[in-house]
């Protein structure tokens, strides 16, 4: 026989080396959809313990970006891994569909409501626009391989959800947390509406910073407080502000009761003035004012100045000095200009002293017609006019322009104002909501754990939540208030339920179409309908109730996990916590996981203007979704997540390593039938048993990492296993046995059994992350099985068996190191043309007693481990001077080129080649494998 190729067990598989994911994945998606795979998964977990991950709804506007992809992929990995762990883990995706951004898009097409279209028509257009946006985003999310109930998602604009949002508000009211008040709120003059804290961004803004003098109304009484009888000129209290436009609303000057204040006389040019400043700020103020000289005439506490009065700098009235806890001496003058209508701290201290909440500014940011001097002027344009008037009145001490952080509208990117308006609030204090929420935060697991202190600080400092908006497209605050007293209707709870029933049938338009008499009868004339809409953060924040309570998958089960970007501590996590605590007295979640933002390779935020945006659609179309999924999983999400073309290229390289490992496994279990060919772990060759044992240990580590949501640990350990323990060691060693042993021999079936068991485990390990590739592998695994890996649980066939005769795991680890040292020597010899390959080498191992004894255990099978034709072990002391040093102090090496004949079939150089006359070019081992019972292997 001259052609021995046919006697070899060469690897064969339909699993291609190249993933071609961009083309192959859409075909799989089609198959998953046709088979209703998500429902198959749901059916496979009926009756199991539930795990509920509640989806934070993205906004239904625009294409998804890389941050959306990170979020949805992380959620998908968790849901799939929990399913593999045996949980019933449904995933109901959602969308946030009301609110200003959608209104603005629709306005661009049809104009503002009430102009070319009615408010009702405008809402229809908003609903149509949002639905179209949902369709586009849904396709993009599904392309990522994310499983979920995509064709039955929750939308905050679903009639049933809108109705349930109204019902949740009713429960908040019943619990006593709602109140109406005139309070300063973040107000966007472009939107013409109040903004939630989460809708406010801070950007740098150039503003006029001014020091303004308020002259004493009673100089004599004031001087007496400082123990001074006389001083030159008038005496003024000085404030520092960066919002000159708020001075028309000034109603007080705030000082700190426990701070020492100084009466300072200073000379500048030919003018002498006396001013009151915080003592610790005197020197910095005098330097800022550029005075020629100054002298402290006296000191007193802020407490002693309470209720003294000072003249408004340009209006004909005086204002009191009041004590405020918000006053500091970090900067400025230590005296705070107080306008209760334009600031939260000002409002709080103003309430304490019964100050007027003056609000001279209209919805559009223009002073109202009854505003003295500045009527009709826009506040930001009026800044210069206020400054000019102060200078004219002699009240301006200093003007300088500064760049500082200032609140901006997240949508318009324009500066906002604080403005007192009648609004509806969820109170943080009147029923102890703040205290209760802080307690619930402690009961929740925060991942990473710094999330707890972050949201605690936010809850400790947050004001009452303004939940009302003056918008068209939103869930109505479905209340009736008395026309004269402004009190809620005493039967509000049942009225809201009746309204909710109508909304459930007709949508939110039902509220605006509703004739009050239909519900109130003869009382209708006494009450008016509230026309405000709810903050969209209320919509999404109440979804634990409005959505989860209405889905049969979630019935009777608490939510286990919320997972969003780190910006949601003040967004969705916060609003959900407030509403759930107000309604039910507890947090809506057991765990909260946050991930960082995506940044480019230089750590910069993604921006179209910078040109550093990486669109997920581009990645999936070019590289495939599994590459994107692997990048997400391999990145530590607890910090910023860096992505670039180079990083994705590295992910593609890592993917190829996993794919090549899977391909080797599949190619070498070709023809293997687990029903008839599976060798029990106890009966395997020792090296195969070690590989199964190592895979079993790895599975424990991977499952723990999945359980702790440490997906980067999963990928690191998986890559290590594929590259080192499998690729560089086990798979390399078994090639000879796999290819040359008799096809159905114990030696080969043992090896195939190990490969099969590892394949069964590995396909499940990668399924939550590399979902497309896992499906591709699953379809080619031998044996009877369900159609999809995603209905399976973690593989239970990995037995961690150690026989008395087995070499220890420590030995195999040491052998892996020895093999690495041998490989280095052979590789050097190849570079120097001493040998053509490892099988041309004969290796001598000079080892100390302990290592010699261990290596000798393998007998002739040591050569198979080292991939050489011949090995011999000698005592370390016998090493010649030219023996090659290794990293191991217990080992030196010698290498020479084999002088024996090369076997045509196995390529080993052996002395017994040609001993069998019928096969003159083969070694006796190969003859046994062709014509006999096959070689016997014990160790490798």
UniProtKB/Swiss-Prot annotation:
Q: Where are the transmembrane segments?
A: none
Q: Where does Zn(2+) bind?
A: 903, 906, 923, 926
* Cellular compartments per GO CC: cytosol
Is this entry keyworded ATP-binding? yes
Q: Which GO terms describe its biological process?
A: isoleucyl-tRNA aminoacylation
Cofactors (names): Zn(2+)
**Which one Pfam family would you cite for this protein?**
tRNA-synt_1
Q: Which InterPro entries match?
A: aa-tRNA-synth_I_CS, aa-tRNA-synth_Ia, Anticodon_Ile_BEm, Ile-tRNA-ligase, Ile-tRNA-ligase_type1, Ile-tRNA_ligase, M/V/L/I-tRNA-synth_anticd-bd, Rossmann-like_a/b/a_fold
Subcellular location(s): the record lists: Cytoplasm
Per the entry, the cofactor note is: Binds 1 zinc ion per subunit.
| Residue ranges annotated as motif 'HIGH' region | 58-68
EC numbers for this chain: 6.1.1.5
Q: Which UniProt keywords apply?
A: Aminoacyl-tRNA synthetase, ATP-binding, Cytoplasm, Ligase, Metal-binding, Nucleotide-binding, Protein biosynthesis, Zinc
Binding residues for ATP: 608
Q: Which reaction does it catalyse?
A: tRNA(Ile) + L-isoleucine + ATP = L-isoleucyl-tRNA(Ile) + AMP + diphosphate
The residues that the entry says bind L-isoleucyl-5'-AMP are 564
Q: Where is this motif: 'KMSKS' region?
A: 605-609
One Gene Ontology term of the molecular function aspect: aminoacyl-tRNA deacylase activity
Q: What is its main location?
A: cytoplasm
Superkingdom assignment: Bacteria
Q: What is known of its domains?
A: IleRS has two distinct active sites: one for aminoacylation and one for editing. The misactivated valine is translocated from the active site to the editing site, which sterically excludes the correctly activated isoleucine. The single editing site contains two valyl binding pockets, one specific for each substrate (Val-AMP or Val-tRNA(Ile)).
Q: Which family does it belong to?
A: Belongs to the class-I aminoacyl-tRNA synthetase family. IleS type 1 subfamily.
Known partners and oligomeric status: Monomer.
**Cited function:** Catalyzes the attachment of isoleucine to tRNA(Ile). As IleRS can inadvertently accommodate and process structurally similar amino acids such as valine, to avoid such errors it has two additional distinct tRNA(Ile)-dependent editing activities. One activity is designated as 'pretransfer' editing and involves the hydrolysis of activated Val-AMP. The other activity is designated 'posttransfer' editing and involves deacylation of mischarged Val-tRNA(Ile).
What is the name of the protein in this document? Isoleucine--tRNA ligase
Species of origin reads Shewanella woodyi (strain ATCC 51908 / MS32)
Q: What is the lineage of its organism?
A: Bacteria, Pseudomonadati, Pseudomonadota, Gammaproteobacteria, Alteromonadales
User: Coding gene?
Assistant: ileS
């Amino acid at each position: 026989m001259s052609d021995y190729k046919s006697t070899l067990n060469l690897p064969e598989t339909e699993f291609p080396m190249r993933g071609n994911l961009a083309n192959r994945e859409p075909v799989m998606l089609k198959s998953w959809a046709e088979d209703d795979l998500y429902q198959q998964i749901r059916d496979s977990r009926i009756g199991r313990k539930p795990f509920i991950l509640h989806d934070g709804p993205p906004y239904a506007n625009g294409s998804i970006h890389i941050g959306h992809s990170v979020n949805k992929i992380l959620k998908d990995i968790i849901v799939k891994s929990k399913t593999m762990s045996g949980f019933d883990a449904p995933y109901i995706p959602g969308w946030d569909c009301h609110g200003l951004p959608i209104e603005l898009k629709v306005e661009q097409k049809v104009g503002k409501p009430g102009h070319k279209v009615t408010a009702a028509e405008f809402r229809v257009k908003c609903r149509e626009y949002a639905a179209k946006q949902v369709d586009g985003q849904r396709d993009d999310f599904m392309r990522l391989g994310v499983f979920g109930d995509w064709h039955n998602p929750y939308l905050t604009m679903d009639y049933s959800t809108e109705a349930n949002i109204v019902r949740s508000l009713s429960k908040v009211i019943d619990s006593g947390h709602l109140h109406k008040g005139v309070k300063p709120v973040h107000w966007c003059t472009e939107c013409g509406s109040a903004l939630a804290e989460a809708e406010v961004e801070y950007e740098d803004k150039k503003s006029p910073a001014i020091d303004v003098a308020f002259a004493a109304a009673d100089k004599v009484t004031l001087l007496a407080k400082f123990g001074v009888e006389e001083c030159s000129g008038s005496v003024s209290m000085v404030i520092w502000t960066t919002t000159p436009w708020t001075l028309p609303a000034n109603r007080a000057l705030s000082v700190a009761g426990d701070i020492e204040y100084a009466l300072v006389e200073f000379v500048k040019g030919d003018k002498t003035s006396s001013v009151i400043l915080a003592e610790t700020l005197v020197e910095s103020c005098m330097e800022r004012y550029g005075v020629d000289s100054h002298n402290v005439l006296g000191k007193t506490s802020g407490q002693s100045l309470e209720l003294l009065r000072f003249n408004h700098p340009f209006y004909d009235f005086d204002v009191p000095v009041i004590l405020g806890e918000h006053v500091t001496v970090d900067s400025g003058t230590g005296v705070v200009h107080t306008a209760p209508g334009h600031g939260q701290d000002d409002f709080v201290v103003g309430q304490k002293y019964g100050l007027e909440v003056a609000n001279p500014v209209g919805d559009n940011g223009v002073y109202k017609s009854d505003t003295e001097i500045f009527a009709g002027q826009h506040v930001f344009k009026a800044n210069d006019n206020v400054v000019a008037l102060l200078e004219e009145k002699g009240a301006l001490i200093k003007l300088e322009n500064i760049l500082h952080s200032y609140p901006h509208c997240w949508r318009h990117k324009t500066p906002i104002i604080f403005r007192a308006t009648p609004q509806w609030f969820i109170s943080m204090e009147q029923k102890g909501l703040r205290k209760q929420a802080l307690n619930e935060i402690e009961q929740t697991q925060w991942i990473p754990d710094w999330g707890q202190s972050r949201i605690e600080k936010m809850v400790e400092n947050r004001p009452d939540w303004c939940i009302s908006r003056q918008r068209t497209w939103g869930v109505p605050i479905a209340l009736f208030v008395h026309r004269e007293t402004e009190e809620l209707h005493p039967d509000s709870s049942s009225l809201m339920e009746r309204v909710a029933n109508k909304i459930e049938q007709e949508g939110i338009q039902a509220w605006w179409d509703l004739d009050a008499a239909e519900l109130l009868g003869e009382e209708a004339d006494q009450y008016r309908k509230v026309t405000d809409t709810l903050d969209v953060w209320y919509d999404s924040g109440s979804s634990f109730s409005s959505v989860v309570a209405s889905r049969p998958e979630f019935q009777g089960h608490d939510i286990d996990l919320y997972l969003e970007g780190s910006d949601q501590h003040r967004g969705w996590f916060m609003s959900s916590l407030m509403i759930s605590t107000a309604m039910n007295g507890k947090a809506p979640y057991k765990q909260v996981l946050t991930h960082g933002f995506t940044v480019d390779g230089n750590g910069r935020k993604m921006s179209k203007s910078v040109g550093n945006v990486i669109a997920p659609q581009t990645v999936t179309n070019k590289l495939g979704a599994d590459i994107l999924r692997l990048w997400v999983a391999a990145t530590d999400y607890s910090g910023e997540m860096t992505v670039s073309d180079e990083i994705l290229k590295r992910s593609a390289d890592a993917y190829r390593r996993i794919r090549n490992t899977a391909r080797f496994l599949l190619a070498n279990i070709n023809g293997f039938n687990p029903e008839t060919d599976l060798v029990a772990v106890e009966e395997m060759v020792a090296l195969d048993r070690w590989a199964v044992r190592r895979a079993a240990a790895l599975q424990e580590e991977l499952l723990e990492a999945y359980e702790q949501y440490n997906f980067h640990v999963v990928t690191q350990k998986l890559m290590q296993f594929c590259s080192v323990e499998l690729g560089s060691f086990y798979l390399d060693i078994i090639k000879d046995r796999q290819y040359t042993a008799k096809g159905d021999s114990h030696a080969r079936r043992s090896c195939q059994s190990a490969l099969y068991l590892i394949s069964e485990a590995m396909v499940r390990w990668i399924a939550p992350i590399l979902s497309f590739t896992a499906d591709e592998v699953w379809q080619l695994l031998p044996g009877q099985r369900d159609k999809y890996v995603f209905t399976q649980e973690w593989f239970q066939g990995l037995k961690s068996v150690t026989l008395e005769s087995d070499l220890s795991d420590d030995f195999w680890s040491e052998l892996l190191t020895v093999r690495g040292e041998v490989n280095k020597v052979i590789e050097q010899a190849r570079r120097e043309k001493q040998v053509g390959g490892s099988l041309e080498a004969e290796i001598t191992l000079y080892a100390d007693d302990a290592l010699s004894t261990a290596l000798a255990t393998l007998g002739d099978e040591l050569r198979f481990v080292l991939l050489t034709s011949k090995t011999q072990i000698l005592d370390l002391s016998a090493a010649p001077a030219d023996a090659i040093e290794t990293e191991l102090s217990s080992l030196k090496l010698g290498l020479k080129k084999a002088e024996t004949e090369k076997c045509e079939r196995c390529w080993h150089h052996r002395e017994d080649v040609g001993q069998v006359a019928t096969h003159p070019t083969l070694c006796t081992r190969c003859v046994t494998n062709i014509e006999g019972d096959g070689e016997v292997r014990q160790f490798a």
